[in-house]
Amino acid sequence: ATIINDAPIVIDPKLTGNKLWEPKNYDGRFDGPMTMRRALERSKNLVSVRIMQAITPQYAQQFIQKFGFMPDKHPAVLPIALGAGSVTPWQMMSAYAVFANGGYRVQPYLIERVTDVNGRTLMRATNRIAGDEAIRVLSDRNAYTMYSLLHGVAVRGTAARATRILKRQDIAGKTGTSNDAHDAWFCGFAGNLVAATWMGYDTPKPLGARETGGGLSLPIWIEFMQDALKGQPEYTRIMPSSVVEVNGEIFYREPIDGAPLPVENTPQAAQPQPMKDLIRDQIF
């Protein structure tokens, strides 16, 4: 529920590693103070840059290694907030699996097993199950918070088409478009099935002035999921006891700086606490 300002910003060349940087939002608008959740749903670039300023690019570069990203591919400069690094769909799929499975890093694989002509198994992939042999890289409450934020994107934000077409309420994900539309992304999951789609050229060049991840990659993801999810019931995700949801926002249960916690399920007759009083700075 942290409030962050969606307003113009100019970044010094020393902080970009290159030249003076004046990032923009895709829609060209600045909508002022908003919650982190709302900013993610609207793909507000300026909010992402301010978050990166708060946590520092150096911390981000170190933290993303937990998800399998290589530090040498992600320079510790502010533009890392908007995808200045280099990633593959394979890496993105592996990273999003952490949010989908509750905080564990699992290793994807392409070939499950190899058999000979007689059906004898010659090789079988080692499958580390989340919560069993896999390493926890994110707390359950932070994984759930990320799910909640990404779920909002698929319900109210730039990926709302996925929920509408698939007619499921367990979808979470994020669209992405790089500078000059060189890359169009959608990464997400439905239940425990994770998929990442990317559209671009082998030799980077613009896909088109108006092309976006929501317009190019999201439809591919939806079409794949239409087949992959056939016969699969919706997944019910359990909220950890360490967080509480109030007015659609997720809060840690322990008090911060002695402030009282928000109250769950406020009765209709009671006066709700103003949202501005519920704001806590949460960096995770």
Where are these regions (language model features)?
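Mid-domain, small-residue-enriched loop/turn segments at the edges of structured enzyme/sensor domains
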Residues: 18-25, 56-94, 110
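Extracytoplasmic/periplasmic beta-strand context in beta-sandwich domains
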Residues: 2, 7, 78-80, 109-112
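A penicillin-recognizing enzyme superfamily signal
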Residues: 38-42, 86-250, 260
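Flexible glycine/proline-rich, aromatic-decorated loop/lid segments
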Residues: 13-18, 67, 112, 189-191
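Conserved catalytic neighborhood of penicillin-recognizing serine enzymes
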Residues: 1-60, 105, 117-145, 150-152
